[in-house]
Amino acid sequence: DKLLTWTDHPIIPTPGAVGTIIKKIAENENISVVGVDIGGATTDVFSVFNKQFNRTVSANYGMSYSICNVLADSGIDNVSRWLYNDLNEKDLMNRIANKMIRPTTIPQTLDDLKIEQALAREALRLSFIQHKEFAVSLKGIQKKRTISDTFDQTMSGETLVDMMELNL
């Protein structure tokens, strides 16, 4: 109730706000957009391609409560590839284990911060893979086609995410 006194606008959950921002950027700039919101338990990926908005939630990839899922699904080698120091695998696993048993702690050393950044990169990578798998055109729909469409190999159910449209 106190928060409502601070604003004249309705308060909306973070995913709704981020989704609105992504849609507005795509609309105002007439571009394709990808955005992410990584939290403690989930990672949300938002995209607009060809004016079509999609949001996916990777419920098992976050930076605190589900950090063990990030490690399990990405593997220690994928996490290690982002680290530029000489942490041995045992030390790395111990530091990640500490984060698993104390998920809300904040990194206290530069090495701990780099490890969390490496895990964040992997959470984003895994979540984006899922997003591309779920952000697809409708399957099984009948499309009106011309004879020239016969030579176009696109099928229903393919991903809507086109990285070449992002102009990175």
Give the label of every model feature segment.
Residues V48-N60, V136-K143:
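Composition- and surface-driven signal marking solvent-exposed, interaction-prone regions
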Residues P15, I21, G39, A59-Y61, ...:
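Fold-independent oxyanion-binding glycine-rich loops
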